[in-house]
Amino acid sequence: MYTVAWSYRVAAGREAAFEALYGASGAWCRLFAASPAYLGTRLLRDAGEPREYVTLDRWRTRADYEAFLQDNREAYAQIDRAGDALTESEARLGSFESE
């Protein structure tokens, strides 16, 4: 399995909109679900700092993830722009492989 982790600081008052976009029924998950290699996303909210979030996007393999990005650049960029309007910062924490 291949997991991509992202960290976000959400703009004050935009938490509900962020959760709607990045949550299990949000635009990101709907886009990713077009791929049979997509295994799901976990949206985590920091217990001590409610404007801090982490997402964990799970894929079968790195190659599957990269192929999906290549094939869906335009749709990915459109959703990413919508997310930019909700956040103060975004950082890729890393990519992780596991069995």
Predicted features and spans:
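Short coil/turn residues that cap or connect secondary-structure elements
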Residues: 10, 14, 30-33
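Hydrophobic alpha-helical segments, principally membrane-spanning helices and signal/leader peptides
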Residues: 19, 25, 45-46
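Short, low-order "capping/linker" segments at domain edges
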Residues: 95-99
